[in-house]
Amino acid sequence: MKKLFFVIIFICFPLILVAQDKIKFGVNGGLNYASLRGNDLAEDLAPGISYLVGVSAEFFLKENLSISANLNYENKTAKDNGNVYLIDEYGFPTMIKSDSKSIYNYLVLPVYVNYYFGKKDDFYVNGGLFLGYLLNSKLSSKNSDNDTDTTDMNKKIDAGLVFGFGKVFQLNDKNNLKLEIRENLGMLNTSDFDVYNDGTIKTNSLNLILNWNFNL
């Protein structure tokens, strides 16, 4: 494995040196607004706001056309603010708020094409695909001191479509900031168990991302 790693570095390093003017690297962070869909119960969950952090690389094919890839760590949440009926110690039904939250931690790899436009090519749209790998998931509830590990209830792989819109703020010849709104639309059923009413569980994540890009 180490030999393969060094072979890849040996091959790629000269290419990076030759094409360094066409390649931008970056670090990014932001917020995601995540929700689930595919069945009535999942769609009743309230979307959750959480965070993402990652790194990026962008290769320019032309001045206004490029291919980008990110590797992001994404924390996704969905909340159940419904009511649960329980039987108390005297045998009477009582209603409490569930206040539970599903938490998913993913590594997400989006690959997409950017098209720049405007007088200074400072606006852009993009589209492509993403691949997600589930690190872990859990169910957290205010009514319990312990979280429930739900990792085994979900498939490890998620994948879907990516599309977004953004603005470039040029800092100098080698550095810029990009502010982007991006949609990750999951297309796979992520549940590893049968879903209520023969449904599915699919992810949806709307991202607000700030990316610092630089040339080496």
Predicted regions, residues:
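Gram-negative (and chloroplast) outer-membrane scaffold detector with strong preference
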Residues: 23, 31, 58-142, 169-173, ...
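Bacterial Sec-dependent N-terminal signal peptides
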Residues: 1-28, 210-216
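Short structured motifs
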Residues: 112, 148-150, 164
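Outer-membrane beta-barrel domain signature
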Residues: 40-44, 98-102, 150-155, 195-199
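Predominantly the C-terminal beta-signal and adjacent terminal strand-loop region
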Residues: 70, 76-82, 152-216
